[in-house]
UniProtKB/Swiss-Prot annotation:
Lineage summary: Bacteria, Bacillati, Bacillota, Bacilli, Lactobacillales
Superkingdom in the source lineage: Bacteria
Family: Belongs to the ribonuclease III family.
Domain RNase III per the UniProt entry, residue ranges: 5-134
Species whose genome carries this gene: Lactococcus lactis subsp. cremoris (strain MG1363)
PANTHER family: RIBONUCLEASE 3, RIBONUCLEASE III
Name of this chain's protein: Ribonuclease 3
NCBIfam families associated with the record: RNaseIII
Keywords: Cytoplasm, Endonuclease, Hydrolase, Magnesium, Metal-binding, mRNA processing, Nuclease, RNA-binding, rRNA processing, rRNA-binding, tRNA processing
Active-site residue list: D51, E123
Cell compartment(s), UniProt: Cytoplasm
Binding site for Mg(2+): E47, N120, E123
InterPro entries membership: dsRBD_dom, RNase_III, RNase_III_dom, RNase_III_sf
Ranges of residues in domain DRBM: 160-229
Length: 231
């Protein structure tokens, strides 16, 4: 962790008060499983917290920066910024994958550069930073790493199929859209999910993805295309 701490200080001016918290953020579930450590020692709880912190900071930034955009447009932008591929790229740009503690099996399967793993790592780091130093530091970090891409309009044109589907269906009147994970397959380090999207109880489409978020987006995309099958 010393190399990571040095990198954080040099690149972002960050010095963690709680080194164990930082280590936990960079500990994958495959590592705790192989080492027979308590499940609470992996980064999943921190990921949960970081996801909320990230969404709040991005929402606040978009609201203040784009006063002319309506709620639907802001939601599309936020969704494109916090989607799996985007967060994985932010994690790569920070060089976080190098410091992730993985199980040997996960390492051999290419887990160090897996999109969902890097997404979760980025969110876990934000969660750890929030606990260690508060929301202001989380905001500063996001301003440094994420916001420059937003300013370049990198995410304005990215399609959020869930939002698009909702807008299409609302044209026809009253609608209640819901998503359900129908199936989970594969080992813990390489899961696949099948999601279905429903409108007023009627299934419209299914999608396959390496995360629940991706599977739901794919289901929405297939629903828009009128393809009621998994792809």
């Amino acid at each position: 962790m010393l190399k990571l701490q040095k990198k954080l200080k040099n690149d972002y001016g960050l010095v963690f008060n709680d080194e164990y918290l930082l280590k936990t953020a960079f500990t994958h579930s495959s590592f705790t499983n192989e080492e027979r450590l308590p499940k609470i020692a992996n980064n999943e709880r921190l990921e949960f917290l970081g996801d909320v912190a990230l969404s709040l900071v991005i929402s606040d930034y978009l609201y203040r920066t784009y006063p002319e955009k309506l709620e639907g447009e802001l939601s599309k932008m936020r969704s494109s910024i916090v989607r799996t591929e985007s967060l994985a790229n932010f994690s790569r740009s920070c060089g976080f994958g190098e410091f992730l503690r993985l199980g040997h099996g996960e390492e051999k399967m290419g887990g160090r550069d897996r999109e969902t793993t890097l997404e979760n790592l980025f969110e876990a780091f934000l969660g750890a930073l929030f606990i260690d130093q508060g929301m202001d530091e989380v905001r500063k970090f996001i301003q440094h790493v994420v916001i420059p891409h937003v300013k370049n309009d990198d995410y304005v044109k990215v399609i959020d199929y869930k939002t698009e589907l909702q807008e299409v269906l609302q044209i026809g009147g009253e609608t209640t859209i819901s998503y359900k994970i129908l199936k989970e397959e594969g080992p813990a380090h390489d899961r696949s999910f099948v999601a279905a999207v429903f409108n007023n109880g009627k299934e419209l489409g299914r999608g396959l993805g390496k995360s629940k978020k991706v599977a739901e987006q794919k289901a929405a995309e297939n629903a828009i295309k009128g393809q009621n099958h998994v792809s």
